[in-house]
């Protein structure tokens, strides 16, 4: 896989209602944070639409999206009509979000879902810690809560490092999402035992 030229953006949200505005959209709980947090924005069907970093500034919220695939500004503007806020969008330096950024993320065991095909991904498959199941309503909450409480999640998305060239001889129920350098991002059955992957498949979990 070659990392295509990303579309990294920053959006600043001003206004007295900025906290309440973003709280009603994101999966995480900004009321419990004072500096920064990661979160998802979902479709009504509970699929990942955006992965964002939110930085709490003195007079605004700074929203960072490493690869804006679906026009984050237009999405926020749709919900902003009933709130006392204003939005400003800035392009970020693409060089900071290229192959080196993506490779460093994989080495640290972090999957940036802005580089994956969003429309098929459940957020709990990737970074469940980006979801606060105790907070109030947000877009897609009903779906993700049902998956959580009824234990309907069937897949996990994990990062593995290849130790040999045979690592691509994968079982049929393994879905290869990304192959980049010496790393694979795989979608696996949730309860599969991967402790023997290194000896059997030449894969080491990151």
Residue ranges and their predicted role:
Residues 1-206:
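Basic, glycine/lysine-rich polyanion-binding surfaces/domains
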């Amino acid at each position: 896989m070659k990392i295509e030229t990303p579309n990294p953006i920053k959006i600043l949200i001003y206004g007295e209602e900025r906290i309440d505005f973003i709280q009603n959209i994101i999966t995480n709980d900004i009321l419990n944070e004072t500096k920064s947090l990661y979160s998802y924005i979902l479709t009504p069907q509970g699929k990942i639409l955006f992965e964002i970093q939110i930085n709490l500034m003195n007079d605004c919220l700074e929203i960072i999206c490493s690869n804006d695939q679906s026009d984050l500004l237009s999405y926020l503007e749709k919900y902003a009509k009933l709130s006392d806020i204003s939005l400003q969008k800035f392009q970020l330096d693409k060089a900071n979000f290229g192959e080196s950024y993506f490779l460093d993320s994989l080495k640290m065991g972090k999957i940036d879902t802005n580089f994956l095909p969003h429309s098929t991904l459940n957020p709990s498959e990737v970074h469940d810690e980006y979801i606060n199941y105790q907070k109030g309503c947000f877009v897609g909450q009903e779906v993700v809560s049902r998956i959580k409480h009824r234990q309907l999640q069937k897949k996990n998305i994990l990062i593995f490092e290849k130790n040999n060239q045979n690592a691509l001889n994968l079982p049929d129920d393994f879905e290869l999402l990304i192959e980049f350098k010496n790393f694979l991002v795989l979608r696996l059955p949730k309860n599969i035992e991967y402790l023997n992957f290194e000896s059997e498949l030449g894969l080491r979990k990151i």
